[in-house]
């Protein structure tokens, strides 16, 4: 066992997971978190692993969904983030959603309670000193300007950025349940769910058209120097989606499919707004897909146009912050280490992965890589056939050449998805040729079965541990 610590900068999901993994490997860790000494535009507390956007970890289906597969692999690897998420889940259909305060508290208590982890509340204003040696930067999308500038100078490259928006949260007791009803889409029950995990607010055609026009006309926050920054398609502001066409929203977050109005079962809604439980008590619900850059007064006015939310009181209104990430394919090796400075690793959203779970997964990997290096052990990266490996491959090199700039690789933030995995040979049922949805489902099952088997072999643990 070594006495020289690994330093982790940033106490978000990636940093907390990295610290946990390294400490569990027997290596001392110093975790540096700048809050509350220095706050950010999006964080509200000084807790570790605070969720500043959605409270959803998305699908928990490990057989036919890529992020559900990543959940399973992280459980196999002893993830603190997944342990805390499972312990603080709230009903959310087929998704794993968590009570954000309970989740953060669980991670904070676990980190502070680990005998090999020391938490230091301070801002690291520049790149770490060389004597720190093994260091992980996991400062996320809200990296302090001084550190961001130091990273830019070290890498010789401009940081890339995109907007990330936050959805409003509504007090449950101000929602009109004589208009709204509980139902998951297609009555699908997820972990801890009942098939009635979302609140649904129906709109007829006239109400929908008036709502879309209000979104288009509503006063937005101006961003000046950020205005030219591209959005990430997975987290578009609701008004930006409305700008893409009058029918865009009812084919996106407001789609009515798979839902039946409990009060008027014979009346088909033209569009539906869904709200998802945000805390364990069930007193708060967030508006699914309603991240926004509308000004606060406009949010209240426009969102109260939604049937059932006419008297809604908001626990939190929507907002917008900027995500910053590095050009990882050019800068990082396959162990997430900076090519120009061995021993310095990056993890989480700053690497260009998108999503809570993906960020935590890369923290998990960085923590294990750093611990192995500190202990003088050679650690092979996870197979590319696993969700872990597919994300690392994406971050460190799985990109096409840019047609606009020959010789430069195209690199954009990415959620885990089946398109990142190597092809798999489908099973061939005797006397039957798979087609359409059946073929797609079989392909997903084949990819996930291969991934879990390969991940189990790589970790040296039985596959069944993923469900524990």
UniProtKB/Swiss-Prot annotation:
One of its GO terms (biological process) is tRNA wobble uridine modification. GO terms for cellular component: cytosol. It comes from the Bacteria. The gene is trmFO. Belongs to the MnmG family. TrmFO subfamily. Coiled coil: none annotated. One of its GO terms (molecular function) is flavin adenine dinucleotide binding. It is found in: Cytoplasm. This is Methylenetetrahydrofolate--tRNA-(uracil-5-)-methyltransferase TrmFO.
């Amino acid at each position: 066992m070594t006495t020289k610590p690994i330093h982790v900068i940033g106490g978000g999901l990636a940093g907390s997971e990295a610290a946990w993994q390294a400490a569990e490997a027997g290596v001392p860790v110093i975790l540096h978190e700048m809050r509350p000494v220095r706050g950010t535009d999006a964080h509200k507390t000084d807790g570790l692993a605070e969720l500043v956007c959605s409270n959803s970890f998305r699908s928990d289906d490990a057989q036919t969904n890529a992020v559900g597969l990543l959940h399973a692999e992280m459980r196999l690897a002893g993830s603190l983030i997944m342990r805390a998420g499972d312990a603080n889940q709230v009903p959310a259909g087929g998704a794993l959603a968590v009570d954000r305060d309970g989740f953060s508290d669980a991670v904070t208590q676990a980190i502070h309670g680990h005998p090999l982890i020391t938490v230091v509340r301070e801002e690291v204003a520049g790149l770490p000193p060389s004597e720190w040696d093994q260091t992980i930067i996991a400062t996320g999308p809200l990296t302090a300007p001084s550190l961001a500038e130091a990273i830019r100078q070290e890498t010789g490259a401009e940081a890339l950025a995109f907007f990330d928006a936050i959805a409003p949260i509504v007090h449950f007791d101000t929602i009109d349940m004589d208009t709204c009803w509980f139902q998951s889409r297609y009555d699908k029950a997820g972990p801890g769910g009942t098939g009635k995990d979302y609140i649904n607010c129906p709109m007829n055609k006239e109400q929908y058209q008036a709502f879309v026009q209000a979104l288009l006309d509503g006063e937005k926050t101006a961003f000046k120097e950020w205005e030219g920054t591209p959005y990430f398609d997975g987290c578009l502001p609701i008004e930006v989606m409305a700008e893409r066409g009058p029918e865009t929203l009812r084919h996106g977050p407001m789609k009515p499919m798979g839902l039946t109005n409990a009060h008027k079962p014979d009346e088909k809604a033209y569009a539906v707004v869904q709200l998802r439980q945000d805390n364990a008590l069930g007193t708060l619900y967030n508006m699914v897909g309603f991240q926004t850059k509308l000004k606060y007064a406009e949010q209240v006015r426009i969102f109260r146009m939604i049937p059932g939310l006419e008297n809604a009181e908001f626990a939190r209104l929507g907002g917008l912050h900027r995500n910053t990430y590095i050009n990882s394919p050019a800068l990082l090796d396959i162990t997430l280490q900076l090519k120009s400075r061995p021993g310095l690793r990056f993890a989480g959203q700053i690497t260009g992965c998108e999503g809570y779970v993906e960020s935590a997964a890369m923290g998990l990997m960085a923590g294990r890589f750093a611990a192995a290096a500190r202990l003088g052990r050679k650690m092979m990266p996870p197979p590319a056939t696993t969700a872990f490996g597919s994300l690392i491959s994406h971050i460190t090199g799985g990109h096409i050449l840019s047609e606009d700039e020959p010789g430069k690789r195209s690199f954009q933030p990415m959620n885990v998805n089946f398109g990142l995995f190597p092809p798999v040979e489908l099973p061939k049922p005797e006397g039957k040729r798979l087609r359409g949805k059946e073929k797609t489902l079989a392909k997903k099952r084949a990819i996930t079965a291969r991934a879990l088997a390969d991940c189990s072999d790589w970790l040296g643990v039985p596959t069944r541990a993923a469900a524990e």
